[in-house]
A protein has these predicted regions:
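Conserved NAD(P)H cofactor-binding loop of Rossmann-fold oxidoreductase domains
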Residues: 79-84
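Conserved glycine-rich Rossmann-like NAD(P)H-binding loop of the short-chain dehydrogenase/reductase
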Residues: 23-37
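Substrate-binding pocket helix/loop in short-chain dehydrogenase/reductase
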Residues: 87-88, 95-97
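Conserved glycine-rich cofactor-binding loop
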Residues: 10-11
Length: 132
């Protein structure tokens, strides 16, 4: 059985991924834990965690806690992200920075933290799904 962590798990793409992973232990991250628990109540081995992945210290603490609990995580799927669908000249700098916090910086931090554990273990896979 593989242990797979998926970010952005309340979105449609993650919901489709989970359907393809019925035998795996899943760690599903999203902003709204209650929504995650409703979506994945029928998956026998899903742990739903509400977290803001732009909160660097919370992410760092979570990664350490998960590795203590599970020993290893086989696959990281960086699925969290969003786009801004407005006229380009109407997008504010604040919106751009917020989007990059989720789509780029949070992805890089989680990849760096979990990648270090995977490198130490000599195995692991990271899948990045990006939005812009």
């Amino acid at each position: 059985m593989r242990t797979i962590l998926i970010t952005g798990a309340s979105g449609g793409l993650a919901q489709e991924m989970v359907k393809l992973l019925p035998e795996d232990r899943l760690i599903l991250l999203g902003r709204n834990q209650e929504k995650l628990e409703q979506l994945y109540a029928s998956h026998p081995q899903a742990e739903c965690i509400g977290i803001d992945i732009t909160d660097s210290s919370a992410v760092q603490d979570l990664v350490e806690e998960l590795y203590q609990r599970y020993g290893q995580i086989d696959i990281l799927v960086n699925n969290a992200g969003y786009g801004i669908f407005e006229e380009f000249d109407q997008i504010t700098n604040e919106q751009i920075h917020a989007m990059f916090e989720v789509n780029t910086f949070a992805l890089m931090q989680l990849t760096r933290l979990m990648g270090a554990h995977m490198k130490e273990a000599g195995k692991g896979h990271i899948v990045n799904i990006v939005s812009m």
